[in-house]
Design a protein with these regions (language model features):
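A short, well-structured alpha-helix characteristic of acyl/acetyltransferase catalytic modules
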Residues: 9-19, 133-134, 144-156, 268-278
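A short helix-loop-beta-strand connector motif used in the catalytic cores of GNAT acetyltransferases and
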Residues: 28, 33-54, 67, 121, ...
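Amide-forming acyltransferase catalytic core, primarily the GNAT-like/NAT-type
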Residues: 116-200
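Flexible loop/N-cap segments at domain edges
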Residues: 187-193, 199-235
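Conserved beta-strand in the GNAT
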Residues: 45, 51-60, 66-72, 185-194, ...
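Helix-loop element at the rim of GNAT/NAT acetyltransferase active sites that forms part
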Residues: 18-30, 153-164, 223
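Conserved acetyl-CoA-binding loop-helix of GNAT-fold acetyltransferases
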Residues: 73, 79-92, 113, 209-222
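Active-site/acyl-donor-binding loops of N-acyltransferases
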Residues: 103, 109, 114-133, 230-282
Length: 282
């Protein structure tokens, strides 16, 4: 069986989304269209006799940084080299950029052999955030803040500027994007979106634990409004305040990944990152 790897269309990716759901990755309802907006050439499918058997994404953000995700092989065809062949074909899309990924424990040794070094662990916390005792104050819809201020805040928390991603991410169908404003200044923002099971929160960027707490409560309330009392939040252990916040709301760890890179990245405000945006695109 000969594997042929080619770029995937948005229509092709509907099948990959189904694979993700089967794997328990809880894909967001509107993720694919936003992901493709960032880099429509960064999605790949491997086929045998015309049938899709593998997938991967290598999404370029700028001239220096790329992110790898969606590394999948159909379960009945694993162990035949299709995954590695797909990986090698797609990784060329990154060129000489530093590549990041969030790897599950079972694959981390393989990623190390491919030149990835661990930076920190990320734990997914899942559960039902209790309704706050009183209305959350200082949190507004993100469209009420200056777009340039929002973009600058996001850029401080991510290894690359990502305007092609950010604008649709905060406005995609079903997404609820909220900003924390303190004394007229933007001090955080977050997004919650419907997904296959629990609603997913990400990013959750904030100046302080108090700002993050207000945003988490407000985002969880928004999730209830679209029928999702339970949320899933991917929190980096590099910011210990993130786990403390999750545990204070009764969320429980579900699984963990490791953020890994092939080289240097620009500095980020790690103490502001209470939840990463997605495990698929970083």
């Amino acid at each position: 069986m000969t594997l042929h790897v080619s770029r995937a269309s948005l229509q092709d990716w509907a099948l990959v989304r189904d694979w993700c759901a089967t794997e328990g990755w809880n894909p967001g309802a509107a993720d694919a269209s936003v992901f493709f907006a960032q880099d429509p050439d960064g999605f790949f499918v491997g086929r045998v006799d015309g049938e899709p058997v593998s997938a991967i994404s290598v999404v370029n953000y700028d001239a220096d940084y790329s992110f790898l995700g969606f590394y999948l092989v159909r379960p009945d065809l694993r162990g035949q080299g299709h995954g590695l062949a797909t990986w090698r074909a797609a990784l060329a899309h990154a060129g000489d950029r530093t590549v990041g990924l969030d790897g599950v424990p079972a694959q981390q040794d393989n990623y190390r052999r491919s030149g990835f070094a661990p930076a920190y662990r990320t734990a997914r916390y899942v559960g039902e955030v209790p309704l706050p005792d009183r209305p959350v104050t200082g949190v507004v819809p993100v469209d009420r803040v200056d777009p340039a201020a929002l973009a600058a805040y996001d850029s401080a928390c991510h290894p690359a500027d990502r305007p092609r991603f950010l604008t649709p991410w905060v406005s995609a169908p079903g997404h609820r994007a909220l900003a924390r404003v303190t004394d007229g200044r933007l001090t955080g923002y977050g997004v919650v979106r419907p997904a296959e099971s629990e609603a997913r929160i990400g990013p959750l960027f904030a100046d302080t634990p108090a700002d993050a707490s207000a945003l988490l409560d407000a985002l969880a309330t928004e999730a209830r409004a679209f029928g999702a009392p339970r949320v899933a939040v991917d929190m980096p252990e590099a910011n210990p305040a993130a786990a403390r916040l999750a545990l204070s709301r009764g969320l429980e760890p579900s699984f963990e990944t490791a953020r890994m890179y092939t080289g240097p990245i620009r500095p980020v405000a790690q103490d502001r990152i209470f939840a990463v945006t997605t495990l698929e695109l970083g």
